[in-house]
């Protein structure tokens, strides 16, 4: 190999390392700003049918920063959806302050009444620009917090805290199908087949979801789910059908 090719290769490796370092640094900065800045009061929103509104707390933990807060709801496909209205949709939030978002039901009872429906609650925090730094090269990052919003009909056949234990499993080729016979969405985590750790899964009500399954995975299943409060349920066991 010529010296020219060696130099080109070394230059490419250095460039790659620099880019990787920059991306890692930016990720750390974003994570730090997200933790120190705007936070939501819940990891998911449950909207009981028939209720006029539900509330979601928003807190600015950064004493020295003001954020513009923009909020909206999307459907399960990630498309903005007017069936739920967030108010106020846009407001400024000073440091060390808390505000409350009100989510209003505008579905007119058009959603299924025998199972939950999934939406996404979005809260974007846009940092204000420091006027003293307008002449400098600065990077302003808007952080979007996105959490699940479940519309829950009244009088479902099964209490929500009993849904996780009803989950069933079926093996087919190189995948494991999770079967949910309940009217609730199930967020499955810490899913194991024998000693193999599998992917997390969101299983729709009265539906199923598949995850990759290694060929040497065992038939004994253990898993946990996330409850209405964002906490993990106790570990459960299941057997492949």
From Swiss-Prot:
Required for the biogenesis of type 1 fimbriae. Binds and interact with FimH. The keyword Signal applies. GO terms for biological process: cell wall organization; chaperone-mediated protein folding. SUPFAM superfamilies: PapD-like, Periplasmic chaperone C-domain. Gene3D superfamilies: Immunoglobulins (2.60.40.10). GO terms for cellular component: outer membrane-bounded periplasmic space. Disulfide bonds: none annotated. Belongs to the periplasmic pilus chaperone family. Keywords: Chaperone, Fimbrium biogenesis, Immunoglobulin domain, Periplasm, Signal. PROSITE patterns: PILI_CHAPERONE. This is Chaperone protein FimC. InterPro entries: Ig-like_fold, PapD-like_sf, Periplasmic_pilus_chap, Pili_assmbl_chap_C_dom_sf, Pili_assmbl_chaperone_bac, Pili_assmbl_chaperone_C, Pili_assmbl_chaperone_CS, Pili_assmbl_chaperone_N. It is found in: Periplasm. Residues 1-36 form the signal peptide. It comes from Escherichia coli O6:H1 (strain CFT073 / ATCC 700928 / UPEC). Its main location: periplasm. Transmembrane segments: none annotated. PANTHER family: CHAPERONE PROTEIN FIMC-RELATED, PILUS ASSEMBLY CHAPERONE.
